[in-house]
Amino acid sequence: MYLPQEIIRKKRDGEVLTADEINFFIQGVANNTVSEGQIAAFAMTIFFNEMTMDERIALTCAMRDSGMVIDWSHMNFGGPIVDKHSTGGVGDVTSLMLGPMVAACGGFVPMISGRGLGHTGGTLDKLEAIPGYNITPTNEVFGQVTKDAGVAIIGQTGDLAPADKRVYATRDITATVDNISLITASILSKKLAAGLESLVMDVKVGSGAFMPTYEASEELAKSIVAVANGAGTKTTAILTDMNQVLASSAGNAVEVREAVRFLTGEYRNPRLLEVTMASCAEMLVLAKLAENTDDARAKLMEVLDNGKAAACFGKMVAGLGGPADFVENYDNYLEKAEIIKPVYATETGIVSAMDTRAIGMAVVSMGGGRRVATDEIDYAVGFDNFIRLGEVADSDKPLAVIHARSEGQWEEAAKALRSAIKVGGEYTPTPEVYRQIRAEDI
């Protein structure tokens, strides 16, 4: 028998907690015998004294086990269960292509996604731009759609990692969000509760990333790989660039439109293709669906080009309540804004930098994201046809096309975009993918 305050005292004094102590504390969080004040104090001691890898593994497992851990064995999927998680960015629509691509190669992807957070877009908000798409199906429907389509993307249920929900809510109001140990446990407890056999983590770097520096992003990636593998789930991380909008679009309906066009081959943004392929290839290799990344990439291009990936996406949408002909007739279903017109730079020159975070916040300001949890999303607004770093902005090449509800909203968005995109000055290219971090690298 332990006392929460003694566990807090021990960590406050810089000592290492045992797995039993961490389990006891997190069970108390889940059953409400640990108070909000004690959660806040516990988080702050970790913030200042950090945790060893063994402590992080124990914390992640305790939070994972605080609620339901999905067991897919009764579904007899007949293939490996794989997933990916991204730390989030702007125009990061990879999940919508990646899930169907991996499914078409023989993987099963039961993906539990989130809503938009701050400047980053949420996969669930994008999918809800599709009429009828149900992000909260029963576990039976979740499993059946995953089996039939190879992929199902839904929202988190209250049964998964409930301790994380309490801890996160307290961290959010006590300045303890940005800590590697706590971020690692929060991300992984939810993902590992989904019954995965392997996971690929996409950690963003740059002006639109969650972590402030390359070094911090790399440290988080290493922590996630070490802890997830320590908890028994094969995991790899990739560090990818978020110094500019990833896709050609940012918003909800505009990104879904781009995802479908990507899957059907109508248009594939080269940066988006590279980052999506990098994540998918790691997933196939980890799941033993490909021998190496070259083999994986060949298989992935094949399912893109022969229509199998697009078919998996269509099957998922229909299985979760969306239109059966969505892939064929997406433009009939996705909401459109009243005003769709380009915005040009005030001067001619090379685009040398983007404040990607500011672009994400511009989408939020238009109503394409939430300031508070109760805000309604406007699915139609956003940007598309983004200029890329290194390209020349002039009277022929706009910065982007704005999808707005009114002239006034268009003007506001144009002003935000012009101040977020730097024209002129030195441009230093950055790679789409900086590096992979595998278990053997740690």
From Swiss-Prot:
One of its GO terms (cellular component) is cytosol. The keyword Cytoplasm does not apply. GO terms for biological process: pyrimidine nucleobase metabolic process; thymidine metabolic process. Keywords: Glycosyltransferase, Transferase. The keyword Flavoprotein does not apply. Its EC number is 2.4.2.4. SUPFAM superfamilies: Nucleoside phosphorylase/phosphoribosyltransferase catalytic domain (SSF52418), Nucleoside phosphorylase/phosphoribosyltransferase N-terminal domain (SSF47648), Pyrimidine nucleoside phosphorylase C-terminal domain (SSF54680). GO terms for molecular function: 1,4-alpha-oligoglucan phosphorylase activity; thymidine phosphorylase activity. Belongs to the thymidine/pyrimidine-nucleoside phosphorylase family. HAMAP family: Thymid_phosp. This is Thymidine phosphorylase.
